[in-house]
């Protein structure tokens, strides 16, 4: 479940990043571009009243054309808000207005959606651009990591998310030191010391469970144990430590201090391990992909044409796609037969006339979409799971450079030589610089 949640989060991040890029590059001819963000606890009526008031003020705009465009955009926003009886649980994001397309023509744009997680920003603008920086809060991708710093004086519990560290819990302890007396006193004090250490270790384990497991679910992606003595090593091996947390240990480090000074040192020493864990899902899935290729299992596919054909056939179970893949999905219509077909080509082939002829018939260009964006919206329709791959890990970089940046795991073995793709008129792999 945790892996699936992470995968879904990656897909949502991809959609937000693409939307931000698209809106940031969009321009209008006037000041009729409405940006509206409503946080979860704010009433829809408050925003409706705000825009209605702004509509009245817009009558003072001297330029008639701009005034009409501004008021049209506000009316569109108000009409869209009427469809919502209340603010969605995660808030509401809306962008609308008249914008210029690639040909410089003015078109109407309207986007509204509930973000995948709560957005705590309240925003309204109506000017010459869309305000998208506030959507960046939805892209906080760094997972939280837990830290336990323990020594002879006590234990500290903290988490680290991105550059933000938070102390979650701490307690002090007084442990008896080694006693210099001999005879029976020595044995008794040694026994007391062992008992006190055992009780301390047990409390560390109990507080760790209370701190890093909530509602029976682990709330950190990995754990770092730190300390100046043997306590951290004993913690990693004791049966008292919750096994759900024990399997999350990614690093054990020696630090010179306890408390927050020890935490700072532990964060510094664990940086490499934290980076590796962030890409562990990516590393695992690509390593499995490479293993299948190495043994010629017949259960994986790569390359744009073969991968997309098998996805459309419902054969692919898991699809892997480089998040920056620039491949286009082009929808064409035969002007005579009205048959609809799709091809997958790089951007520099978009205006090549050979892609828009079928014998003597011309093919009309109906729609052009980025393939990765199309996959993010439609992958589930084919019963597949989608993994977005970066080039930030060694495995991801190899997948992008050596396997076209797209591939998949098949539900069953397929003879790839017999794939028939009626639209496979372009050998994508021969084109350089397609990623």
Curated annotation (Swiss-Prot):
What's the protein here called? Answer: Eukaryotic peptide chain release factor subunit 1
Please report which protein family the annotation says this sequence is part of: Belongs to the eukaryotic release factor 1 family.
Q: Which residues form a coiled coil?
A: none
Q: Where in the cell is it found?
A: Cytoplasm
CC per GO annotation: cytoplasm
Pfam family of the protein (one):
eRF1_3
Annotated source species: Tetrahymena thermophila
Quaternary structure?
A: Heterodimer of two subunits, one of which binds GTP.
Q: Which InterPro entries does the entry mention?
A: eFR1_2_sf, eRF1_1_Pelota, eRF1_1_sf, eRF1_2, eRF1_3, Peptide_chain-rel_eRF1/aRF1, Ribosomal_eL30-like_sf
Extract the GO molecular function terms from the UniProt entry. translation release factor activity
Q: What exactly does this protein do?
A: Directs the termination of nascent peptide synthesis (translation) in response to the termination codon UGA. In T.thermophila UAA and UAG codes for glutamine.
For this UniProt record, the keywords arranged alphabetically read as follows: Cytoplasm, Protein biosynthesis
The principal location of this protein is cytoplasm
Question: Any S-S bridges, and between which cysteines?
Answer: none
| Stretch forming the signal peptide | none
Q: Which gene encodes it?
A: ERF1
Which SUPFAM superfamilies does the UniProt record give? L30e-like, N-terminal domain of eukaryotic peptide chain release factor subunit 1, ERF1, Translational machinery components
């Amino acid at each position: 479940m945790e892996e699936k949640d992470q995968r879904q989060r990656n897909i949502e991040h991809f959609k937000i990043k693409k939307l931000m890029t698209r809106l940031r590059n969009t321009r209008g001819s006037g000041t009729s571009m409405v940006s509206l963000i409503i946080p979860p606890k704010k009433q829809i009526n408050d925003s409706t009243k705000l825009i209605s008031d702004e509509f009245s003020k817009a009558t003072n705009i001297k330029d008639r054309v701009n005034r009409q465009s501004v008021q049209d955009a506000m009316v569109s926003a108000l009409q869209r808000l009427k469809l919502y009886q209340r603010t969605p649980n995660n808030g509401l994001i809306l962008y609308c207005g008249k914008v210029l397309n690639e040909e410089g023509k003015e078109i109407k744009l309207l986007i509204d959606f509930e973000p995948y997680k709560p957005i705590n920003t309240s925003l309204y603008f109506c000017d010459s651009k869309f305000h998208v920086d506030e959507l960046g809060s939805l892209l906080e991708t760094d997972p939280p990591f837990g830290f336990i710093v323990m020594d002879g004086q006590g234990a500290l519990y903290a988490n680290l998310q991105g550059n933000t560290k938070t102390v979650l819990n701490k307690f002090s302890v007084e442990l008896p030191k080694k006693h210099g007396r001999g005879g029976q006193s020595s044995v008794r004090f040694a026994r007391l010391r062992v008992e006190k250490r055992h009780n301390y270790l047990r409390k560390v384990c109990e507080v760790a469970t209370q701190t890093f497991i909530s509602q029976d679910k682990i709330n950190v992606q990995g754990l770092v144990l730190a300390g100046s003595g043997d306590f951290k090593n004993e913690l990693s091996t004791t049966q008292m430590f919750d096994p759900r947390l024990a399997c999350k240990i990614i690093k054990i480090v020696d630090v010179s201090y306890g408390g927050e000074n020890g935490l700072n040192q532990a964060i510094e020493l664990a940086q490499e391990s934290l980076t590796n864990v962030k890409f562990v899902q990516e590393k695992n899935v690509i390593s499995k992909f490479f293993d299948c290729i190495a043994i010629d299992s017949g259960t994986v596919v790569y390359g744009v044409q073969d991968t997309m054909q098998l996805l459309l056939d419902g054969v692919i179970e898991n699809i892997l796609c480089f998040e920056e893949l620039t491949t286009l999905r082009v929808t064409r219509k035969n002007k005579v037969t009205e048959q609809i077909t799709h091809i997958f080509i790089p951007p520099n082939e978009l205006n090549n006339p050979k892609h828009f002829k079928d014998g003597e018939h011309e093919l009309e260009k109906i729609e052009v979409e980025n393939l990765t964006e199309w996959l993010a919206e439609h992958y589930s329709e084919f019963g597949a799971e989608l993994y977005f791959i970066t080039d930030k890990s060694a495995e991801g970089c190899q997948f992008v450079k050596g396997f076209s940046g797209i591939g998949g795991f098949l539900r069953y073995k397929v003879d790839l030589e017999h794939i028939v793709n009626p639209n496979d008129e372009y050998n994508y792999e021969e084109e350089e610089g397609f990623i």
